[in-house]
Every structure is written in C-alpha cells, then in structure tokens.
Regions:
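Nucleotide/phosphate-binding catalytic cleft detector across ATP-hydrolyzing
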Residues: 1-159, 174-191, 203, 210-241
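Ser/Thr-glycine-rich phosphate-binding loops at phosphate-binding pockets of nucleotides
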Residues: 162-168, 237
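A short helix-loop
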Residues: 171
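Long, charge-rich alpha-helical interaction segments
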Residues: 194, 198-201
C-alpha cells in the first residue's frame, strides 16, 4: 500500500491459491449466503449477501471476470490492507496482474470488472468500508517481480512464476523481455494436489482432504496414518519429476 496525494495505491495478486497484498495473504475462496451464517470471523457483507472469505477453494477459471467471486475477494483484500492502518474510507487505485500471455486479451475486461462500481460500500469484520475506486492498472504477472532491475540483467535469463493455477515463463535477453518466448501453462501447484488426491482415491477408495495433501506438500508430514502418508509422498515425487 502506497499513498500518492489523496489516493491509496493497493497492489493485489489475484492468485488461484491465495489473494495477496503487500501486508496480507488469505486463501482464494468464499461461500455466499442469503442470510448471516453461524460463524462470522471472516464475514464480508456486500450488496445484500453474506460471504465467508477464505472458505473452500475456488475452482480454476481462465477468465477471472466471469463471476462475482474475484470482485468480492478484491473488496476483502482492500479491506485487509486498509485495516493495517485503521483506514475505513479512501480513494483507491488498484494495481493487479494477469498471467503473461492472457494480459493483452483480458486486461480491458478485467479492468472494467474491477472498476464496475466507482463508489462501493461494504462491511468486513463488522467494520463498514466506503471506497472510491479511482482507477485500475493491469500488469503481466512474473515480469513485475524483476521489472525494477531488468535493465541490469545480461545474457539470457528465464523468469518462472509458478502459482497455484498457472505457470508463467518469460525469456529475457540482455534485460529485454522476448514477446515471442513467453508462455502461460495451466500447470500450477494445485494440479499436483489434484493428482495426489486422485491417486490416493484409486489406491484406497477413500478421499483425502486437500488441506492435508497441501500440508504434506509443504512440510513432508501430516497427522495421518503412515501408510497414507507414504502414498501421498510417493505420488508427490512422481508428479514432481
């Protein structure tokens, strides 16, 4: 979050696994209700609906503007970032990203999607927020990470941005991106989770929760039987080859 004159600039990474800002990170998922749910710790209320933020896992969609979910998750991300400085009303400029090869084709629609309401009010964590969205800029994912020092790169460099839903690869030659050598593949870490889940089900006729699989992928262990852990670790190694 940066302040420029009377505007707050907030960078948001709309990941398939996690929503991220400079100071916050939370799972990309939500559940919508028509009335207030029993548990309200991560409750966002917007446009007459109740959303539990961070619940479930949003399934992969190639166009993030196709439904309401990423808009609501954006509101939550802004609120979480503003809450670090106890701000509840502000002029906001959103800086967001899209996968490399999708940026040109989708940036106009995604920008309009995030700008759909220039004035927006909602409640998050029982706190009211009032925002004026002044503008949106869309940038290519991955490249943004090295942009500040790209001119210092020499020779051939390969930038790999491996996310939950996609993997972006960009070739750089003497600090300049090669437009003809950039790729976006639907092969992120969640595909590994799905492969492990399917293999486990085939071998045991039981379903293993994604959270347990992800814990094993991150730490190499989980509170499950040793035989189950062995299946997960074996499939993890197979997929990772």
């Amino acid at each position: 979050m940066k302040k420029f004159n009377n505007t707050i600039i907030i960078g948001i990474d709309h990941g398939y696994g996690n929503m991220k800002t400079a100071n916050c990170c939370f799972p990309t998922g939500l559940i919508a209700y028509n009335c207030e749910p029993l548990f309200t710790k991560e409750l966002l209320v917007y446009n007459g609906k109740y959303y539990l933020i961070g619940e479930e896992h949003k399934e992969y969609i190639s166009d993030k503007s196709l439904d309401e979910d990423f808009y609501v998750l954006t509101l939550a991300a802004i609120a979480k970032e503003l809450s670090t400085e106890s701000i509840t009303e502000a002029n906001i400029y959103i800086a967001a990203g899209l996968p490399l090869t999708w940026t040109s084709g989708q940036k106009a629609d995604f920008s309009a999607y995030l700008m759909r309401n220039k004035e927006v009010s909602f409640t998050f964590h029982k706190q009211e927020y009032h925002l004026h969205i002044e503008g949106v800029s869309i940038y290519p994912q991955g490249y943004a990470a090295i942009a500040p020092y790209a001119s210092k790169l020499t020779g051939v460099n390969v930038i790999a941005d491996i996310g939950n839903g996609t993997m972006n690869v960009l070739y750089m030659v003497n600090g300049k991106p090669k437009s003809g050598k950039m790729f976006t593949e639907k092969f992120g870490t969640y595909q590994c989770t799905l492969a492990v889940r399917e293999a486990f089900m085939q071998q045991t006729q039981r379903e293993l929760n994604d959270h347990i699989i992800e814990e094993v992928l991150r730490t190499g262990k989980a509170d499950i039987p040793k035989s189950d852990l062995a299946i997960v670790r074996s499939e993890e190694r197979r997929v990772g080859k």
